Amino acid sequence: MCCVLGYAGHDLSKEKFTELLMRTASRGPDDQRVAETEFGLLGFGRLAIMGLTPEGMQPFFRGNDCVVCNGELYGFRPVKKELEADGYTFESDSDCEIILPLYYKYGLDMFNHLDAEFAMILYDSRKKWLIAARDPIGIRPLFYGYSESGHIAFASEAKNLIGLCKKIYPFPIGSYYCNGKFVRYCDIADTPAYNTDDMDTTLTKIREKLVAGVDKRLDADTPVGFLLSGGLDSSLVCAIAAKKLGKPIRTFAIGMSEDAIDLKYAKQVADYLHADHTEGIINKEIVLNALEEVIAMLGTWDITTIRASVGMYLVCKYIHEHTDIRVLLTGEISDELFGYKYTDFAPSAHEFQAESQKRIRELFMYDVLRADRSISVNSLEARVPFGDLDFVKYVMSIDPARKMNIYNKGKYLLRKAFEGDWLPESILWREKAAFSDAVGHSMVDDIKEYAESYYTDREFAEKSGKYAYCRPFTKESLLYREIFEKYYPGQAEMIVDYWMPNKAWPNCAVNDPSARVLKNYGDSGK
């Protein structure tokens, strides 16, 4: 991960701007640079992944035009060769150096030509345009706000803008900002028509496109590792990578000392793949001590995001401190595409698809936010193969009647697509467990118990009543909200709501986001 920061004004000192940039120094620990430009100030913190030489440091300039990008542009080398044939020259092996020439070639339509995850700020000196843009899923974070003097600012994280902007907003996904306006260039969740592929073709395309999504994310000039929970999604990513690389991959799992579900299944997968596997063991004390740090780095008050981030943050912390790995592949975004436990209760195919679209459009506030912050705060880069644009577009084009749980097994199409020698049958067809549960049922119970003892009933009633927006409804949610407000005062509206199952559906009127409370959880998490 890297950090970008831009301010469209000349009333902010370079020293203050640098202090704002350095708040997220862990995103870009290798080097930091602040440039004074025609429009204002532009900053970049580098985590070198592609093109490791000093020439790969941003901002990239061509004349007075400039760009900073926290991103990964997949398949950039053939594009670079085409640009070289057009007469452009390059000084580094960085993928992001091709952005300005691409902009010259395509203009604002450039964003539709990118197979990438990115958050960028670009200045066109000829047109005097300040442009910012974000990828269609929002895998790379970007926020914006306005200073007291009315100047717009863009930043990788909300914490970069605290004190500069009164209100901070998530930059809309699949959109660009130009000349004072936001424009949606891609709604990846929108499906004008479903494809007509038969079942065999559908399964083949699911497999081939996910394999391609993993393969392109193995391209790095630094060591690559894998988060392995032992669940279907992360196990598939690891299995594909192991086949592609043809050598032992490095996998990491974490679990509570008492009842970690993940560790058992992760070891089964690692042994099957002959992986170089590392286990991390945590306990109640470690979890509770990490809680405030986790919420501060996340910038959310959402219950399930915080719960699931604790284990992820701690395993990434271990990887940062004990290995040379810089890139981590993860299994996020499969649930939004193929269904959660609660989507078993979808009343119709239409509602299943609408729910999937909603979840994809909100990913940047929940699972994607969790993966980005938990990994980047530890100076690592997250790559999410299930978020591959070609893969997402295809899966969203599958008739939802096929994706619903009509087979008595969730994610049937994904499982069926990888039958064979990819994974042990016991893993391929294993029921889903919530990540925070899989780390250990006791982890969530420990946090709840702590919150219950932290507030009396009277204190809970008084303190939760202070919040008109998304009022905390349990002592656990109040604990999270109070810590959030300590670090992000008045910014609660960055998150639209608590992540919960669709309460309008049968059997989904629950007040806890964990799949554990659903009546169809069954043997999940055992």
Question: Where are the predicted features?
Answer:
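Short, basic, helix/turn surface patches
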Residues: 60, 117, 121, 302-313, ...
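Cytosolic ligand/metal-binding cores
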Residues: 335
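ATP-dependent adenylate-handling ligase core
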Residues: 258-316, 322, 339-353, 373-374, ...
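Hydrophobic (often cysteine-bearing) scaffold residues that line and stabilize catalytic clefts
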Residues: 13, 92-95, 114, 199-206, ...
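Cysteine-centered catalytic environments shared across enzyme families
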Residues: 1-300, 322, 326
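Short coil/turn segments at secondary-structure boundaries
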Residues: 33-36, 112-116, 167-172, 219-224, ...
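Adenosyl-5′-phosphate
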Residues: 1, 19, 324-330, 342, ...
